[in-house]
Regions:
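Cofactor-binding active-site loop characterized by glycine-rich and histidine/acidic residues
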Residues: 96
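Catalytic cores of Mg2+-dependent Asp-rich isoprenoid enzymes
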Residues: 1-90, 99-110, 129-138, 153-166, ...
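Helix-coil boundary and interhelical linker segments in multi-pass alpha-helical membrane proteins
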Residues: 147-151
Length: 287
């Protein structure tokens, strides 16, 4: 793994290091020739993912997402905008022939962040996780040189890793979303576990919330298990995009040790020894 000083990082690299350190660390295990493209892709994701946080009303959020749809369209038309993320993203798209539909699916998935209604059920939540998480992993795999003919196992594993990572992130973000009066816990899960959104929005943990959290965590763990089953079929070049599985597994174990209380300080903290954990997984040729 390469350690990089802040001064040596590009704009996208610096943004990723500051705002999505987990993904930044996984990039350091990618070949140097692919790293800037990963930085650009993941920083694009940052820009799209923070939409609901930086706008005051859904209509403005829709305008922001449309800006990114148009920016991606212009990249594929060969006339990228002058923008500090769009330009390097355009270089990544051109250099690695990235599939346009995955960008569209990711942006469309983020529209759900602007909807005040929670997902109806776990299937709907997993659909959101697949659109926003798995699509991003798929693009990262393309940057790393995974091809359709040789990479079916990698793409299948990537789908499971992307969903697991997104679900894990949503569970860890329950307090943050509650402060914004946003709820991602499915309606049917909340009803089944007697979770009161009112209590949640007052930032109160409860046994009922823990049971709902556990149900979603078990789903995330199941996706990791499915990804792990494919380990020996995944080409080595794909592993940097799948290393998030190592971190997701660690976060889920912490959540389990905290009795599935998303408000527990340990759950909110960054995983200790993240870099070493990733290094150990990479040395063992795992993810």
């Amino acid at each position: 793994m390469n350690t990089l000083s802040k001064s040596s990082l590009s704009y996208c690299g610096a943004e990723l290091r500051r705002h999505d350190h987990d993904r930044f660390l996984t990039c350091l295990f990618a070949p140097a020739t692919r790293r800037e493209a990963l930085y650009a892709l993941y920083t694009f994701n940052l820009e799209v993912a923070r939409t609901a946080e930086v706008v005051s009303e859904p209509m403005i959020g829709q305008i922001r997402l449309q800006w990114w749809r148009d920016a991606v369209a212009e990249i594929y038309e060969g006339r990228p905008r002058q923008h500090q993320v769009v330009q390097p993203l355009a270089e990544a798209v051109q250099a690695h022939s990235l599939t346009r539909s995955h960008f569209a699916r990711l942006i469309d998935g983020r529209e759900q962040d602007l909807d005040s209604d929670p997902p109806e059920d776990l299937a709907a939540l997993e659909g959101y996780a697949e659109a926003t998480g798995a699509s991003l992993v798929r693009l990262a795999l393309e940057i790393l040189g995974v091809t359709r003919s040789a990479g079916e196992a990698a793409f299948a594993a990537g789908r499971h890793v992307g969903i697991a990572w997104a679900l894990t992130g949503l569970l860890r973000a329950v307090p943050f979303h509650a402060q914004q009066k946003r709820l991602y816990l499915p309606v049917d899960v909340c009803a089944r576990r007697d979770v009161s959104p009112g209590d949640l929005f007052e930032l109160r943990s409860s046994p009922e919330l823990a049971r709902a959290t556990e149900e979603i965590a078990v789903s995330a763990e199941a996706h990791l298990v499915e990804a792990y089953k494919l380990r020996h079929q995944v080409p080595a070049v794909a592993r940097p995009a799948l290393l998030l599985a190592t971190l997701a597994g660690g976060y889920l174990k912490t959540l389990r040790r905290a009795a599935f209380d998303p408000f527990a300080p340990a759950v909110q903290a960054d995983a200790p020894g993240r870099a070493w954990r990733l290094t150990w997984a990479a040395l063992r040729r795992r993810f």
